[in-house]
Amino acid sequence: MSVQEITETRQYLTFKLGNEIFATDVAKVREVLDLTTITAIPRTPDFMAGVINLRGSVVPVVDLRLCFEMSKTESTRNTCIVVVEVLLDNESTVIGALADSVEEVIDLEPEQIQPAPRIGTHIRTDFIKGMGKRDTQFIMILDIDRVFSAEELAAVRGQETGKPLEAAA
């Protein structure tokens, strides 16, 4: 979904990675968890923090900071896991994303969202749905379905099903 496709007010969950504020559509967010024990999985990509047990389900957890070529997420009292539902080949997949902190849920009007800059950002522009502007602050609105490439998501889904991670080896 591009900026042009946003035609109505939407709600976004805002969260911090480092000093930058990001947002994702609340419709994609299942829940926000306090940081819990994450079990590391050998031979997975660096961005794959591990898995958690969420009410009997194995949920892969990804370090978004590493996905965006930032330093690894440090554990603080504000660190949390944002559990999101993304589409891979028209199939719903639940993934946890580490965030330094969750800020708030905000409403953004279509006119408050501008296209992402094509240069000057360390995040791939196809990951960014747009730049939200609230007061004097810019918020990077993520297209959470595109944050992970098909290959990376396939590796994460392999963890859920116990299939080998040939692409990640």
Give residue ranges: language-model regions.
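An acidic, low-aromatic, low-complexity terminal/linker signal
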Residues: 1-169
